[in-house]
A protein has these predicted regions:
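Flexible, compositionally biased loop and terminal segments
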Residues: 1-226
């Protein structure tokens, strides 16, 4: 049984290039795809946790100011739509924002993020996590800093100091866009996850594509390193 799926949303910019569009038009197409996908997950599956790699810390630091500004606008529109979606309340979905998103310069976006966190904090049926300004090595580094005065450190101690302390291990990690790497996503929590890579660029990733990944997972035998 799948409890937790992680999804690396990759391929927006290549999709825009393929269709002779501007990079931010690819991000907007990805936003619309994500809306369809999350609604499908929320209403049509029994998977409790879905974690989305929306913006890496590396991309936040290195992308051009213009692209980031337009990306923030796309994120804001997406979260406003999510905030007003009745499905959040109906399915009791809690929204978590994970990473150093306090670094975001866009005050309106941060306001929306704080609002959606507050509005859904008591929901307990499903958990939808957005990783923004996140990097797995940075997460572990920050955990180490928190443990500087701890005398006996165990795996549980480390987990309890991670940004993802309230999330279970990832069962299935999906990456769209054709790349075969983790790019720093949830490094501690994907240690025994099944990995599924697809060449489909994220704006073209459909609920059917999502189900194909789940079917592939169910056909595998998990060994957990044994």
């Amino acid at each position: 049984m799948i409890k937790h799926i992680g999804l690396i949303l990759d391929g927006n910019r290549r999709w825009s290039k393929k269709h002779a569009l501007k990079p931010w038009e690819g991000h907007e197409a990805g936003r619309l795809t994500l809306s369809i996908l999350t609604r499908y997950w929320a209403s049509k599956t029994d998977i409790k946790y879905l974690s989305l790699y929306a913006l890496s810390l590396k991309n936040f630091l290195e992308r051009s100011s213009l692209e980031k500004k337009l990306l923030y606008g796309s994120l804001e529109r997406g979260f406003i739509d999510l905030l007003n979606d009745k499905l959040l309340k109906k399915e009791k979905i809690r929204i978590k924002i994970i990473g150093k998103w306090n670094l975001l310069p866009d005050k309106r976006l941060k306001k929306v993020l704080n609002e959606i966190i507050s509005k859904t904090k008591k929901h307990n049926k499903k958990v939808l996590s957005f990783f923004i300004c996140y990097d797995g090595q940075d997460e572990i580094t920050e955990a180490a800093k928190e443990m500087k005065n701890v005398q006996r450190i165990t795996r549980s101690t480390i987990k309890n100091n991670l940004f993802t302390k309230d999330l279970p291990p990832v069962d299935l990690l999906i990456r769209t866009g054709g790349e075969h790497r983790l790019s720093g996503f949830m490094l501690w929590d994907v240690s025994y996850a099944e990995l599924y890579f697809t060449d489909i660029l994220f704006p073209d990733f459909t609920p059917s594509s999502f189900n194909n990944a789940i079917t592939e997972y169910k056909n595998r035998k998990r060994r957990f390193g044994k």
